[in-house]
Amino acid sequence: PKEKNGWALGTLSTGAIAGTLIAPSIGGALAQWFGMENVFIITGVILFITTLLTIFLVKEDFQPVEKKDLLTTKEIFSKMDHVSVLIGLFVTTLILQLGITSISPILTLYIRSLSGDTENVLFVSGLIVSIAGVSAIISSPTLGKIGDRIGNQKVLLGGLILSFICYIPMAFVQTPFQLGVLRFLLGFSTGALMPSINTLISKITPTEGVSRVYSYNQMCSNFGQVLGPMVGSTVAHGFGYSSVFLVTACFVLGNIGLSFFNFRKVLNKKL
């Protein structure tokens, strides 16, 4: 039911978040146990099993839209009451993925500079990346339910603020343990943002255009995944590893300002 969108999309988002954040450590372990070339075979088998499960177990009550009833992109946007909110959600998706992926090129090197331990640096890096997935798994469904009660826009803003608070001290940590604690807290932010974004999109978009709008949001997500490593490596090369977290925090701060501006009229309403 539509009133349970936050909980349902929160649970669904948990799988996507967990896969993105935990996969590096799983991939590293599999490569160590079975060899790097066999990781591709194992991944292919898992994807094949997932395909079969989707075909035979996922059922939906889908009513296709007649071709004559299909809306153009302009018509979809004209039927929306909160277009600026939607644009802001696209930006939030992009910034979220940029933040997650911007540290990818430098994380192992950053951890090595903190610890000086070259033997276990890959294991520790995988653990620190994955720990954010654990907290996201814990928090995502619960935060989705909270969003259903108090409004997903409030949960989204809370997630952005927590994200900003976590990124700043990451630039000044002295040990990998401190970085791991902050990454764990950052996972709660991720668990708040993804369900809130998806739920708000479903609520403000006309039924006839939901799939198309989600595809635009996915495009922003993919762009963030491409942009993140480029930004991270460029900033690290020019200003040092710590600067990556500060630059990411600046992106998040700008997103907070944009979100407050877009939500100013609906902050205390349930969309």
Enumerate the language-model features and the residues they cover.
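Cytoplasmic helix-loop-helix junction between adjacent transmembrane helices
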Residues: 1-16, 200
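Residue-level signature of mid-helix packing/kink "hotspots" within the transmembrane helices
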Residues: 20-21, 133-141, 225-226
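Structural signature of the two symmetry-related core transmembrane helices
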Residues: 44, 154-169
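Pair of pore-lining "gating" transmembrane helices in MFS-fold secondary transporters
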Residues: 83-102, 184
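Short amphipathic helix-loop junctions that connect adjacent transmembrane helices
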Residues: 106-123
